């Protein structure tokens, strides 16, 4: 059911960047609680969402956008340049409060990222998704993404990201 009334996607301001970590701490246990250990969840949130990390990525051209229900932040996404040949954008993050799943908002956010990639002249939009995140895999496939490769990335601390790399041709 598509119910995106009142949902807005807009760039996060500098002052709102700390919200990304807050949202991740709220959303990740529902998303990854049956896939990753609590220790790995904490490690990855600190590694990816600490304010200096987000500020550095933003300075490198990564866009951070909030998904709002009215004024209430309910999710976020980030995307940015990936490689020049062929021109490809990377969707780094897309997370939505569990209570907002199944309403078409994730697809709305994906289409938003696809439109940004097209505006940037990209031919592909690429992302990584945990191999065991069945709901996300289905959502990406419904939006035209296909599996390009499988990767296992050592992220330090004794943890790995065991992902599929998916992409959509634009």
Question: Model regions: which residues?
Answer:
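C-terminal "cap" of GNAT-fold acetyltransferases
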Residues: 88-89, 123-126, 130-137, 141-143, ...
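Acetyl-CoA-dependent GNAT
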Residues: 2-7, 11-17, 21-100, 107-112, ...
């Amino acid at each position: 059911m598509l119910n995106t009334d009142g949902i807005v996607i807009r760039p996060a301001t500098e002052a709102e960047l700390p919200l990304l970590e807050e949202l991740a701490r709220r959303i990740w246990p529902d998303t990854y609680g049956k896939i990753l250990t609590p220790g790995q969840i904490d490690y990855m949130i600190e590694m990816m969402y600490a304010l200096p990390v987000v500020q550095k990525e933003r300075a490198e051209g990564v866009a951070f956008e909030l998904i709002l229900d009215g004024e209430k932040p309910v999710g976020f996404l980030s995307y940015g340049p990936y490689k020049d040949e062929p021109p490809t954008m990377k969707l780094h993050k897309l997370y939505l409060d569990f209570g907002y799943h199944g309403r078409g908002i994730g697809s709305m956010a994906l289409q938003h990222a696809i439109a940004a990639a097209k505006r940037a002249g990209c031919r592909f939009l690429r992302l990584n998704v945990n191999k065991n995140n069945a709901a996300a895999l289905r959502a990406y496939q419904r939006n035209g993404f296909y599996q390009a490769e499988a990767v296992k990335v050592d992220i330090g601390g004794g943890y790995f990201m065991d992902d599929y790399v998916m992409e959509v041709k634009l």
